[in-house]
Amino acid sequence: MKSFYHYLLKYRHPKPKDSISEFANQAYEDHSFPKTSTDYHEISSYLELNADYLHTMATFDEAWDQYESEVHGR
C-alpha cells in the first residue's frame, strides 16, 4: 500500500501552482515527516504539532481526500 507521503510527492513542483504542491514541496524537505504512514490521525497529529509550513489543515484534508479516492478507491 502506498503511503500518504509517497502519494503526496507526485504533487511536488519547482514552482508550486497550488497549496497542495506547496505542501508536497515542504513535506519533502521535512525529514521528520511520517513517510511510511497510511494513518490519517498519525499524520494529522504530526502536522498539527510540527509542521509550521502548513498554513491550514484544510490543505492536508484536501490532499488526504484525494489520496483516499485515488489509492483506496473510497
Swiss-Prot record:
Pfam families according to UniProt: YozE_SAM_like (PF06855)
Protein name, UniProt field: UPF0346 protein YozE
Record family assignment: Belongs to the UPF0346 family.
Source domain of life: Bacteria
Chain segments annotated as coiled-coil in the UniProt record: none
Transmembrane portions of the chain: none
